[in-house]
Amino acid sequence: MKLEPQGDSCKLSGRLTQEEVARLWKTRKTLLPDDARRLDLSELTYSDSAGMAFLMELVSLRKGELTLASPSPQVRKLIALYDLDAFFSTEGQTR
C-alpha cells in the first residue's frame, strides 16, 4: 500500500490488508497531513476487514471530517456489508 499526499487529499493505492494495517498502526495518528480532508481511494485495489477498520480509525481520528473519494466497487461493497454508509462520507466512485 502506498500513501501519497496531494494538497488537502491523500491518495491510497495498492492493497490495504491486515499485514499493511499491522505495519501502519503505530503511525496512524501522524500518517495523514494535518490539512488532509479527503482520502482518494481510486487506486486502492483491495481492502479486507482490517483495512476497513483502519479507514474507520483514520476517519475517527479526524472526528468524521475525512471523506473517502472514489472508492472501488469492492470497497463500496464492504461499506454496505458492514452497514457503514452512515459512518463514512463518500464521493464519486470507480468502476
Model-flagged regions — what are they?
Residues 1-50, 57-95:
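STAS-like cytosolic regulatory interaction modules
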